[in-house]
Amino acid sequence: MDNRPISRSAIPNLEDLPDDVKTKIQSVQEKTGFVPNVFMIMARKPDEFRGFCTYYDAIMETECNITKAELEMIVVATSAQNDCLYCVVSHGAVLRIRSKDKNISDQIAINYKKSKITERQRAMLDFAVKVAKESQSINDSDFKILERFGFDIEDAWRIASVASFFAMSNRLANTFSMLPNEEFYACLLYTSDAADEITG
């Protein structure tokens, strides 16, 4: 059991939060049985919390040509590149649920190029990692590779949006030493419906 504080930042009392923020957190708790630490950490800034949740839902929950499991692969691969403990553990948990593969998260976090994934998924992650680490060097050839695997410009936008959003999340989590909940390590106990709620 990790007894360290979950963040360097102050953690608000649930009862002191605006009603809509409190309702969101309580809804997550009802569905999953716990409150992911990121919710309480972000809730200290209600406007940022609302923006965080809205953008998360827009890029992670809306339908596109990329599966929800593949979106989680992007989060895990790019967060690993950014050395983000919180996001690798929490989204690794969701990836195991969504992919129904207990090994995939560790493989992607350690070395996605050697992971048991398709060539299409590897091309997707190559692009995502380049967005996360060296976006200034992205050029036409990167988009041509995506096109070869069936990704269009809107898919490229989604990949880049996920990588960019979580680059921000990774930096906040690292700066304020955010710790993942113990419950994430027992993720296989949760259902796919719960996976929609436990990260953001």
Label for each model-derived stretch:
Residues 1-192:
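Hydrophobic alpha-helical segments
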